[in-house]
Every structure is written in C-alpha cells, then in structure tokens.
Amino acid sequence: MNFTLVGSFILSLLLGISDWKHAEFFKKSAAQIREGVPAYRTVWSSGIGGWHWYALQNGMKPYYLDSSVLKEGDVMVLPKGLSQYRISSDLEVTLLAKLWQKTGPLSFFSGNHFLGLYHNNFGNPPWTLSRNSTDTIYVLGYLGKRSDNK
C-alpha cells in the first residue's frame, strides 16, 4: 500500500475521533449543566454550532448580547472560544462552575477552535496538536445589573 494513502487514512481517523470526542464533551456537559440547575431557573447559553444544538436540546435559551432579558438567579453558560462568547458588561455574575474536556491520546489532534474542521484561513489551520485541554465551559450565576455605585 502507498505510504501517503495509509498516512492520510490514519490522520483522517484520528481527526474524526478527536472531533467526535469534542462533540461528546459538549453533549454530556449540556445535559450535566441542565440537570444541575433547578427546573424553575432559566438557563441561558451563548455559542453556535454543535454546542448551540446540544444546549437547545437540554432546554437552554439562546443568550443574545443586546436583547436577552435575565432575572436574578438565572444561569448563563459560556463555552470559551465560540463566537458569541461574550456577555453584556453591565451584568453582575458569579462563577458557579468551570468544566473542561479531559485530554488524552484521542484528543491530541484537536479540531476544536472556533469552527474547528469547518473553518480555516491562511496561518490558522483547521486543526492543531495539543496536550492541553482545549474546551472550557463557564457556568455563571446572574446577580443583577451592575450599578455605577459598586
């Protein structure tokens, strides 16, 4: 067999597994977060793509910077690195939890920055090699609007 063909197959397999592990982290985290919050609390989530889909499947509402109206006690979920990963600067929040993807040989080929394997540009390849955790999800409690007196 041709070395190039075998190498391409192995690389494709490793990237596919890494992408699957990335999606699995989002899927499990969305369910875990929703299960950990009382049903009477609204959970808001920012982000796009697979994370957005899993968040909606678990009853989270999409958070929009300029139009979402939060109540004290609501929970916000922000997956780091996705577009829309920001909140209004006038919100007072507290960190409730921080989740991150466990690393291992199957996550070494990381296709999970911004849009991962679905987006690239010159100098920014669609995947990287990394032994560090590349996914972090912040769970925040909403305390109310910031006042100028604080």
What residue ranges belong to the model's regions?
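Core SAM-dependent methyltransferase catalytic element
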Residues: 125-150
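Catalytic lumenal/periplasmic loop and adjoining terminal transmembrane helix
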Residues: 2-132
